[in-house]
């Protein structure tokens, strides 16, 4: 035949290519242009294995037959446009392979098809011309089921056709006479009219598609629901006369708050409204809340979520009653973060500074941190208002030497024991924590009792009184015998603090008992002569102190009259150089000791040294006859102390 020379041109060692995986589409074509192929098949062909003799006698014929079978199957899978452009050679090869398979491969002889040997030929591909005009058909289509439609390759959207559920519902409603149907009628129309639903009308198999019908009726705007006039009847479903959206509308889930323009507009309006409200609050500066909101650290600037956490933290130094600066803000001041080195410059101002700021409370003064630094800070104090208790006495004549907590200037911490125990001879009865009291501001250096401080410091004139919190029975001090004031007598000293706007030393719970012997070495005749000239007769002094009445929330007045007769001028010469401890002034400020001469006119001294209204703090005149009547029951009215300190009356006589 004419195709025989072309069969010879095929390589005798050519073997069928292995079929790629079925999931790949389109399948790759074998390379026919190559004369030699290095591709080998893992398994020999079935025809060659079945007929080894024929394969041995006609290797080229069997190879051509297998290649023709492979090409016939491949032609059914390939697209028409991908078909090779050499139809003549392919057709000749296929024909030669068919002839070889019919004569030698199956019958074992060289008879042609005209010899009468009838064998079932393999399925032949259509000619190249018609093949290019038809869509590709899978291998299964070559069988007897080639006429049935295939779901995967058809253009149908659903199993029943290209119509959607909405289209089917539309056709059902339009087919009715009244152009309206109930839900059950739509179900019936589906089962009767659509072949796919004919066998799915029962309740078990209709749950899925009936649910889809109800879903589409509610989803699409082209269907409207009309209330049925009859009682107990379901509603009518009609087509929307205004048209509505045809087909499927986008899913409602797609129109979320993130991508829907309606929600975006509403959010933008809400944001603008919020911004306008905030700007209005900032503009209304007259309201107190706006002033605090402008403050970055104010509670108004915090959100409600952060306010609880923010308000729970309240540092010790930021309480309303114990702020150094006097500000009643719960916010920590920037000075609270200072180190110990910086606290000194803040707490202890220079000597020239005015003492008009608010004094610290006792709870803040008794801070252990401030107690540690007091010794160093006391050495740096040069203000006249600082504590300069210098009761002179010889070391061998001290009777009782106990540390006394004395006060320093305002804005300082509570005092630690004094550094010089050979010089300070004063004791303490107790230090009890007291309730926070309203602290009054002090004036300048010359505060309420600057003159009285010097008056009590007269050399040898006053034997200072011992005072402290007394029990309700009000112990009265015994008068001091004039004979006690001898060169070797003992003088009991007391720090008396008196002022209308101040508190007693350590709030009246501490008494400084200054016991000192009176040596005869340091004598000052000038002081004694002047004192005897001014006070030629005994001056009884009635001093009202502030005791504590246990069980009562009020302060009582205990008058402790102490008769201090003036001794002989020669005896006073032995006492002249030893002035007793000056009285506490203000918030425990001690007056300076002085060795200067006492003014002859005590009235003039008080007028000169005092810068306050004496009548507002002293009910009686200072120099009323022969007595000094000090009444301080109006100091700290209705003030109660938490502890009652029992103090006995001390009296020292020469032994």
Curated annotation (Swiss-Prot):
Tissue/organ expression: Expressed in umbilical endothelial cells (at protein level). Abundantly expressed in skeletal muscle and ovary, with lower expression in the heart, placenta, lung, liver, pancreas, spleen, testis and small intestine. Weakly expressed in the brain, thymus, prostate and mucosal lining of the colon.
N6-acetyllysine PTM positions: 245, 248, 262, 265, 274, 423
Residues marked DNA-binding (site): 158, 165, 225
An MF annotation (GO) of this entry: DNA-binding transcription activator activity, RNA polymerase II-specific
Region described as Sufficient for interaction with NLK: 283-563
Top-rank taxon: Eukaryota
Annotated Low complexity bias: 33-63
Record PTM Phosphothreonine, positions in chain: 24, 333
Keyword Membrane assigned: no
Subcellular location: Cytoplasm; Nucleus
Region (Disordered): 1-63, 116-158, 234-344, 507-537
Keyword field: Acetylation, Activator, Apoptosis, Autophagy, Chromosomal rearrangement, Cytoplasm, Differentiation, DNA-binding, Methylation, Nucleus, Phosphoprotein, Proto-oncogene, Transcription, Transcription regulation, Ubl conjugation
Compositionally biased residues, Polar residues: 309-326, 507-534
Pro residues bias locations: 120-141
Subunit organization: Interacts with LRPPRC. Interacts with RUNX2; the interaction inhibits RUNX2 transcriptional activity and mediates the IGF1/insulin-dependent BGLAP expression in osteoblasts Interacts with PPP2R1A; the interaction regulates the dephosphorylation of FOXO1 at Thr-24 and Ser-256 leading to its nuclear import. Interacts (acetylated form) with PPARG. Interacts with XBP1 isoform 2; this interaction is direct and leads to FOXO1 ubiquitination and degradation via the proteasome pathway. Interacts with NLK.
Family annotation (PANTHER family): FORKHEAD BOX PROTEIN O, FORKHEAD BOX PROTEIN O1
Disease affiliated with this protein: Rhabdomyosarcoma 2: A form of rhabdomyosarcoma, a highly malignant tumor of striated muscle derived from primitive mesenchymal cells and exhibiting differentiation along rhabdomyoblastic lines. Rhabdomyosarcoma is one of the most frequently occurring soft tissue sarcomas and the most common in children. It occurs in four forms: alveolar, pleomorphic, embryonal and botryoidal rhabdomyosarcomas.
Protein name as catalogued: Forkhead box protein O1
Gene: FOXO1
